[in-house]
Amino acid sequence: MMVDNQTPDSSTLSTASTPVYAEPQLTEELLERFDSFAQKVARHDGVSAFSEQTRIELSKALRESTLTPPRFFVAEDNGTLAAVFVALTPANDEDTGVIEAAVAPEYRGQGVGSAFFDHAVRQLGDDATRYRLWVHGSATDTGIESPAHAFATLHGFEPVRVLYKMVLPLDAQTREELVERSDARTLPENLRMRTFTGADEFPWLRVNAAAFAHHPEQGKLTLADLRERTGSPWFRPEGFFIASEVEDDSAIAAFTWTKIPTGQEQSELSPSGEIYVVGVNPQAQGGGLGRTLTLRALAYLACAEDENGEPLRAIDLYVDADNTAAYSLYTSLGFGVATVDRMYAPAQQDEPAA
């Protein structure tokens, strides 16, 4: 997220002139520069400013023509990306778009982000009110608000959604307990546990859409979105669990997908794995399938290694703050809130008095 009212590190303070704003045509070279920029911001902030879906949409726009391509704005200073603003365009008249943005660490505290953000929003025109702004790492588990939260409110946005990142550190005892809990769970006799295959693409998309019919992002996944993910270096089919009918593999009752990102830097809680998504067919809800599949995924991650053979040191996941059932489940399993992401919408303007 755009951060501008933060005191910059004097060791990296830029003395450059005012950056030039542009909405350049997306190219492979520009996408590589964006990736480097996003990685630099993430290393500095400890949290990514851009979601996986944003990166996927940019990649798709580069490869294929689309009716609603993302808007991509940059503030550039002599070949250096000082700030980036990405707006994922609404797919239809009822849809909302998503904004994610960031300022390079060395350009913060100089007014670069504020001026650039205002410029990019103006370029969206009358449609700007249809966009929602993501602030990743808006607050910590201690409740301390980030400069990005202050930035969002300063620019006329108010929180409309709260997403918790929850983390479970792994030690020998926790690993053993997760495996034991998973082994103690059984599926109904008409279901079997298996892992994802290519033949599951369309059945999975149908169940995912039904399970997340009211979810602003997950329920909209397309075949192209799915294939972007299953074609990613991090994808492991053995970590994508499906409960389907014994007599019909296409009848999916529930699923849990895990993710072990590649290229993780070593730290106290890294490498880590993620409970990527858990879904239950609405026709199969209420029978504890979500808990059973979640425990199976946790047991898998507890015993998994990264691409370098390093055991995972933590498991993380994301849950909406208003999903009290899921939050209670994860808390009971030992997860704690690490950071808070917030989605913001333009603040409602009061009608002028008659």
Curated annotation (Swiss-Prot):
List, alphabetically, the Pfam families matched. Acetyltransf_1 (PF00583)
Q: List the disulfide bonds.
A: none
Binding, 1D-myo-inositol 2-(L-cysteinylamino)-2-deoxy-alpha-D-glucopyranoside: E52, E217, K259, E274, Y318
Catalysed reaction(s) here are: 1D-myo-inositol 2-(L-cysteinylamino)-2-deoxy-alpha-D-glucopyranoside + acetyl-CoA = mycothiol + CoA + H(+)
Q: Where is the N-acetyltransferase domain?
A: 21-176, 191-354
Regions of compositional bias (Polar residues) in chain numbering: 1-18
Q: Which EC class, in a word?
A: transferase
PANTHER family in the record, alphabetically?
Answer: ACETYLTRANSFERASE
Which family does the UniProt entry place this protein in? Belongs to the acetyltransferase family. MshD subfamily.
NCBIfam families recorded: mycothiol_MshD (TIGR03448)
What protein name is recorded for this chain? Mycothiol acetyltransferase
